[in-house]
Curated annotation (Swiss-Prot):
GO biological process: chorion-containing eggshell formation
Right arm (Gly-rich tandem repeats), as annotated region: 81-119
Stored Pfam families: Chorion_1 (PF01723)
The protein, known as: Chorion class B protein M2807
Region feature (Central domain): 12-80
Keyword list, A-Z: Repeat
Region spans: Left arm: 1-11
Amino acid sequence: GGLGGGCGRGFSGGGLPVATASAAPTGLGIASENRYEGTVGVCGNLPFLGTADVAGEFPTAGIGEIDYGCGNGAVGITREGGLGYGAGYGDGYGLGYGGYGGGYGLGYGGYGGCGCGCG
């Protein structure tokens, strides 16, 4: 075997520092001085977990409250990655008369990566 890690294998060595920053939420915004009661439904994949912001002053008499819920409470990434399939040089395998191809095609010997999204 060669040196180095392949697809699906852990790497050993120094740490890997990562810095990330989420994009600002877009697509859904409610801003008003009124009171909203009820349910706001959002379907689809959202690029953020959720935010709630209260700005301004609450009156000295009364209450202020934010109730926020998101699904069943299980927050996570549901799907990530590519297909893992690729088209490439067919190395002689392809459609042709008598089992002989023209040398190029989508076929058995094509290079398409390792199928895990890293190659």
